[in-house]
């Protein structure tokens, strides 16, 4: 099993790197926190490479659409902030290109594992925009969009120093993803753990 992050693997179609139809217009291979342009076509072009490695299955980080605004500093290149669970992110390709990749992978004896994340989504997803109640999600209040105001940040401090772990995480029966998330931000990792291990891998 070979796990890969499509945005970081290979750019097979530079024309889909920045699209007018998407809110985030940032793509810069020199910026670690921005999109780099890898896509499904880049993976398809390298299927023989995986055969040469002896790989029998590919596990991608999510490739579903993330139409979130970009700030030029960071992006959800990793795929874990879905805004549309029915469509491949056009910066990765199309649903048809995804099907073509799967078909060609199967012809070469490769299986495809799709990473599906239904325990959270992007802030621009309709589930967040139209919540039936304020506590619909198990989410620290400071992460909710209505709390991302200068007044609120002044009140509680910033992530990069003034805020403490107790301000960021509350006691709950749910497992909060930043604690055990291998794709967590540097700030989250510094506030929680130094590594990540899953015995089933």
Predicted regions, residues:
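Substrate-binding/active-site clefts of carbohydrate-active enzymes
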Residues: 9-56, 62-201
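Mature N-terminal segment immediately following signal peptide/propeptide cleavage
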Residues: 1-10
């Amino acid at each position: 099993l070979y796990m890969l992050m499509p945005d970081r693997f290979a750019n097979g179609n530079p024309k889909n790197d920045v699209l007018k139809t998407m809110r985030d217009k940032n793509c810069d291979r020199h910026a670690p926190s921005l999109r780099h342009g890898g896509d499904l076509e880049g993976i398809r072009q390298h299927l023989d490479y995986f055969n040469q490695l002896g790989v029998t299955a590919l596990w991608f980080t999510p490739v579903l659409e993330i139409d979130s605004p970009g700030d030029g500093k960071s992006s959800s290149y990793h795929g874990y902030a879905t805004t549309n669970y029915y469509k491949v992110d056009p910066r990765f390709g199309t649903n048809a290109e995804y099907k073509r990749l799967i078909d060609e992978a199967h012809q070469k004896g490769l299986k495809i594992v799709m990473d599906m994340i239904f325990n959270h989504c992007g802030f621009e997803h309709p589930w967040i925009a139209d919540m039936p109640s304020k506590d619909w999600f198990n989410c620290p209040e400071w992460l909710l969009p209505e709390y991302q105001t200068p007044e609120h940040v002044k009140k509680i401090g910033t992530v990069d120093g003034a805020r403490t772990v107790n301000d960021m995480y509350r006691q709950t029966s749910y497992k909060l993803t930043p604690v055990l998330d291998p794709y967590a931000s540097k700030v989250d990792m510094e506030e929680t753990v130094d590594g990540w291990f899953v015995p089933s891998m």
